[in-house]
């Protein structure tokens, strides 16, 4: 919830990592962090045995930069036009072949302030001021990049060439979304923007309310069906007209309660899920809802709280709550089908449907396969070395049945079950 351009400081970091790994092995400990873990944390880290039905394996991995470090981030790879795109928070943007991880092109948007001989040497392991990339998406043969510095860029999907750049007054902490030639960008300042995808011209903006205290993060927008769907930090789900930005409707999903600002947090920080004519969303303080797209009418509500994105496969909706409990519900009526609590407190990611399973990552770099029908964990693989620095911090990506993950340290891995 945090090395080639694909890793300038990697030469030094990996050398140190090898030395540490040797010392750890000799001492008989699994990781350095074990030395400092209390019994409660060790209990969380001890995974319960499973009856594995298959054995996933890492097909390839690639270090694409410095990752997201300890920062909260929803930066994750994107698959489009038969290419895999990934970025690190610091500024590296990379296009890869999804079959083998080979780099097709790369850009570095980190800011360098000096050009002296010492700066040239220092760049071997550091890469300037962070571009603070917050999210990437692909549409209209363009790769869109949003940053916490309030910059939105469009890159050519084949070459990485910058096509246009715009500024917004606020942090872009979630991937933009595009439809019908309009790019929708949400900001931490509560303002929603519409840009022309081809030219970068600002078409509209919509000002929203921001309470005194909110979560670190924002709802990712969804541009679809002539609307821009968004969750707000005030507990509302809203739809703006895509062409003009005018508010079509808004519906209260969660209401503030409690005496303190902390108790009154009601953020809808997840990206809404549009399935058929229904929007699904969930609030941090405990409201999962299905809402009619045309009218904003609430179809059903249930008490589940989360800041993780929802996912849907068939008639099931999958929820990972604030404590890393995993649930499957019938999306038509909100009836709970099963729950899985054995990964509790492991900072589990949102679930990604892959075939007959859902796949989640966790805070110690493990990836788990769970049967959609039963909720049983049937396979797992260690991608991060049981180390929090290599946590899987956001939902895995499904690329034609191959699971792609990214660790906090910036390692993109493709995992096969064949």
From Swiss-Prot:
Part of the Bam complex. It holds the Pfam family PQQ_2. It is a lipid-anchor. The gene is bamB. Its main location: membrane. This is Outer membrane protein assembly factor BamB. Keywords: Cell outer membrane, Lipoprotein, Membrane, Palmitate, Signal. A lipid is attached at residue 29 (S-diacylglycerol cysteine). One of its GO terms (cellular component) is cell outer membrane. It comes from the Bacteria. Part of the outer membrane protein assembly complex, which is involved in assembly and insertion of beta-barrel proteins into the outer membrane. Residues 1-28 form the signal peptide. Belongs to the BamB family. A lipid is attached at residue 29 (N-palmitoyl cysteine). It is found in: Cell outer membrane.
